[in-house]
């Protein structure tokens, strides 16, 4: 509905928050839904920026107590690597794109931007970061996606927990790997270094 109305009234300043690899993780429901919106934007000829963020670093706020209390990093993210991104960086890029489109004297064409962090991290990498931050050993117990789903069912609908499990299984087989030049492009766009997982962990522990 929103895209049809945008087309009818001639809105030229559209920034859509999709997800990295939306065109590849097609068995993951919320990825497939976002890719459907991307296709609509493209096929309708809308001038938009499509932002494709990787795994949100701030997702891990929810497992701080598990890390500090049990000495494990429980998210089944595997060993391919995820280019985890800070949501503040996402918000800043979105704002910059809206401003760029607002200030342009001519309509700006469709473009896609992968939003990634400075590091592509495995489960072992993240456990090591927590070990350094806390000064106590933190281990990565492995890739139990079924157990991950069962745990999520305690506080979200079953269908959503299943969706999350499917996503985590794709983490294990493909990861979330940035394209060549993504990190440099974002660093140039923001005019500063990208926020890292270590920055997040330090801040969370000191809060």
Regions found by a protein language model. Give the residues of each.
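Oxidoreductase cofactor-interface core, primarily capturing Rossmann-like NAD(P)-dependent enzymes
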Residues: 4-13, 19-139, 143, 150-151, ...
